[in-house]
From Swiss-Prot:
The lineage of its organism: Eukaryota, Discoba, Euglenozoa, Kinetoplastea, Metakinetoplastina. It is found in: Mitochondrion inner membrane. The chain crosses the membrane at residues 12-32, 48-68, 79-99. This is NADH-ubiquinone oxidoreductase chain 5. It comes from the Eukaryota. The gene is ND5.
Length: 101
């Protein structure tokens, strides 16, 4: 039963990351389209869009690093709780771990 809860958790996590990817490419494609558009020739708007694109890239990479380290911590935490205390419902302790952080 541990592996069932573990797999369902990571299915939800991967689906969430997939949704974030879709939103990211939708936003960045719009920014790139406007950056190379004929109506957007003024230097100020190109610089503004370039800074905005860099800021969006920074936000998403920061978000990915936070998710990556959180998933690693929850993976280790899940294994420690399961093998140390032999409990079935490890996701509850993952939630406690997130609240603790």
């Amino acid at each position: 039963s541990f592996y069932l809860y573990y797999a369902s958790f990571f299915d939800i996590a991967l689906f969430t990351v997939f949704i974030i990817d879709i939103i990211k490419f939708y936003i960045l494609s719009g920014v790139i389209f406007y950056f190379f558009n004929i109506d957007c020739i003024m230097f100020f708007w190109r610089v503004f869009l370039f800074i905005t694109m860099g800021f969006l890239f920074f936000i998403f990479t920061t978000w990915y690093f936070i998710c990556f380290y959180m998933y690693i911590c929850m993976f280790i935490w899940n294994l420690v709780i399961y093998f140390r205390y032999n409990l079935k419902y490890c996701l509850f302790f993952c939630m406690l771990f997130i609240i603790y952080i």
